[in-house]
């Protein structure tokens, strides 16, 4: 589906974070806002410091916070927790990402 393609484009594997019901309820703006919050949190936030997003059009929102910082070789990496709230329902996901040479964060 186009929603799953958007998740792939956003660098998020749908199944790794969100159930299909929640993912199917997110629009392109939600996905991009969640991605931007995730990238900001991974780059800038201390462990357990949240980055939040809220789409005023859809009413959907979420938070992401790093839970651990570590290295793989020369790459800084972080574990994180992400909570997406759609229609009052919270879906929690966990992930790991490492910073690439170009400064982007790649999910592991």
Report each predicted region and the residues it spans.
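Amphipathic, membrane-inserting segments
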Residues: 33-94
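Short, low-complexity, glycine-enriched hydrophobic/amphipathic alpha-helices that associate
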Residues: 1-43
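Short beta-strand edge/turn micro-motifs at domain boundaries
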Residues: 102-108
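Short, intrinsically disordered/low-complexity patches at protein termini
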Residues: 86, 101-102
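Short beta-strand segments and strand-loop junctions that repeat across beta-rich extracellular domains
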Residues: 95-101
């Amino acid at each position: 589906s186009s929603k799953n393609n958007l998740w792939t484009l956003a660098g998020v594997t749908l199944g790794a974070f969100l159930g299909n019901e929640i993912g199917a309820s997110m629009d392109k703006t939600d996905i991009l806002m969640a991605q931007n919050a995730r990238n900001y949190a991974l780059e800038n936030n201390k462990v357990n410091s949240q980055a939040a997003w809220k789409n005023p059009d859809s009413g959907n929102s979420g938070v992401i916070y790093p839970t651990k910082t570590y290295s793989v070789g020369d790459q800084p990496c972080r574990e994180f927790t992400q909570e997406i709230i759609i229609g009052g329902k919270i879906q929690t996901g966990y992930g790991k990402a490492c910073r690439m040479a170009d400064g982007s964060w790649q999910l592991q």
